[in-house]
Amino acid sequence: MQVYLFDNTLDGLLTAVFDSFFRKQQDVMLLVEGEQLPLFADEPYRVVTDSEKATRVWKGLEKHLSKDGLHMITISWLSEERALNQPLFNFICKVFRPHPLTPSPRGEGGAFGREGSLNTLLSLERNASDEDVLAVRNTCRRVLHEQLRMKQFIRFQKAKDGTYLGVVSPDHNVLPLIIDHFQDRFNDQPWLIYDAKRHYGYYYSLTPNPSLTPNPSPTGEGNFKGEGSNYKVIRVTFEDEASVPFDLSNGKMDADILSDNDQLFQDLWRTYFKAICIKERMNPKKQLSDMPRRYWKYMTEKNAT
């Protein structure tokens, strides 16, 4: 077995797929740089991320898989789970290899250019009996489930300048998946959604900024409405998080920039939350299932002033 070391990026993983075919190595263990190597392993091969190789592999996937299959890859990658690396690598490699169900003739362009049987490829991406496919599909489901929860559980605070701030810390990197939702729903007000765990966020401005240009990856990951036309959605990071005007531990905005009436609205929301609670029908177990405790620290109704 040949060990491949890569930089834990999607482009790096796609490059590893390309290199494994170029080097004609099928039995590959994919590890991230710095991970412990297995005993008695040969000298590892270090994958140098190459955007051209990654683009070529992705274009091959676009020919071989349905849109759902492509989304399964990109969405599962947002899980940031290292346990996904090997199954995802194996799954992508299987796409380009002849499948036992139906032989796929090789055409021009090598493995990444051949046209296989669509029915065969659809059978592969839906084959729950394949442990690699199942691992990728289950990971994709977990990410989509948290995406839905983020849409439900983000709580905003209003600053004096009219900007709304929402701080989150999801298990998975779901911000790129929810920005379209908030842009469609709150397109008449500026807002910032910040991921305290990953130290970045997205700012929606009412004023288009044509000087900003998107920098998409070959997979299209991270592209959403606002990029490419009006550039109202801007990815932001802070050089010094110690100076940000909000508390990363609970998402609370500093009192000196908080809108004068926002505290009143927070108190009203807590009062409403308590008022609609029917004590005789309280079900803490059900509540924890629908609203996991890990989200509470950023939710207004669960935090007193």
Task: Please tell me what each predicted stretch does.
Residues P190, Y202, R235-T305:
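Long, compositionally biased intrinsically disordered terminal regions
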Residues L122-L206, S229-F238, A242-S243:
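Internal, well-folded beta-alpha domain core
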Residues L31-P98, G116-L148:
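Charged, alpha-helical interface segments at or near domain boundaries
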